[in-house]
C-alpha cells in the first residue's frame, strides 16, 4: 500500500462531449497503462489510475446532472482536486456549473483544461474569461481562482505544455488525501484510496 503522500485522487468535471473520456484515454496511453492498439469501452473511465513519478493518480468520473447531486457530492468528498475540462468553442455549460459549484464549495483546487482548441470555431480567450466569471459567480476563494490553465486537443493527445508538466499539475495542485479537512470537519487522519 502506498503512503498517502504518494496518492492523489482527482475528479474530472466536464459537460457531455467536451472530451472527458478522450482526455483520460490519452492520459492512460501516455503513462503506459493503456496501449494505443487497445480499444476502450465507452464510459469505462468511471475510475482509472495512472502512476507518474511515483505518485498514483486516481481519476474519478463525475456525473454531471443535478439528478445525481448526492452521488456527485459523495464522489467529490473522495478527491483532492479537480480537472475542469471545457470545450474551447462552447465554453462552460450548465452541467459544468453544477458540478464545479459542488467542488468549489468543498474547497477543492482546480486545474482548467480548455480542450478542442483546434476547432474552427474555437475561442479560447473568451472561454477562459467565461471560466473566470464562473469561478467568481460560484464563490471561488482566492486560491481556487488562481487555477493553472492547459490548452489541449485531447483527441490528438496534445497540450500546450509538455506531458511531464501536464502530469505534474494535478499532483502539485492537490494535497495528499487527508491533508486538508473538508469544511465543517476537524483536521485529523483521513485517507481514502479508490482502487
Show which residues each predicted segment covers.
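P-loop NTPase catalytic nucleotide-binding module
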Residues: 1-16, 88-195
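P-loop NTPase switch module centered on the Walker A-proximal segment
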Residues: 1-86, 99-100, 126, 130
Amino acid at each position: 500500500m502506498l503512503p498517502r503522500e504518494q496518492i492523489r485522487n482527482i475528479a474530472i468535471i466536464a459537460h457531455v462531449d467536451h472530451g472527458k473520456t478522450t482526455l483520460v484515454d490519452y492520459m492512460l496511453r501516455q503513462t503506459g497503462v493503456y496501449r494505443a492498439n487497445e480499444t476502450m469501452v465507452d464510459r469505462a473511465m468511471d475510475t482509472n489510475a495512472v502512476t507518474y513519478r511515483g505518485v498514483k493518480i486516481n481519476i474519478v468520473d463525475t456525473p454531471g446532472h443535478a439528478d445525481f447531486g448526492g452521488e456527485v457530492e459523495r464522489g467529490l468528498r473522495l478527491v483532492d482536486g479537480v480537472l475542469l475540462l471545457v470545450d474551447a468553442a462552447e465554453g462552460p455549460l450548465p452541467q459544468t456549473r453544477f458540478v464545479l459549484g459542488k467542488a468549489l464549495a468543498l474547497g477543492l483546487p482546480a486545474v482548467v483544461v480548455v480542450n478542442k482548441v483546434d476547432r474552427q470555431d474555437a475561442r479560447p480567450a473568451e472561454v477562459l474569461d467565461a471560466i473566470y466569471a464562473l469561478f467568481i459567480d460560484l464563490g471561488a476563494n482566492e486560491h481556487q481562482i488562481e487555477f493553472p490553465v492547459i490548452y489541449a486537443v485531447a483527441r490528438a493527445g496534445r497540450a500546450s505544455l509538455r506531458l511531464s508538466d501536464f502530469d505534474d499539475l494535478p499532483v502539485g495542485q492537490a494535497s495528499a488525501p487527508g491533508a486538508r479537512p473538508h469544511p465543517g470537519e476537524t483536521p485529523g487522519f483521513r485517507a481514502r484510496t479508490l482502487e
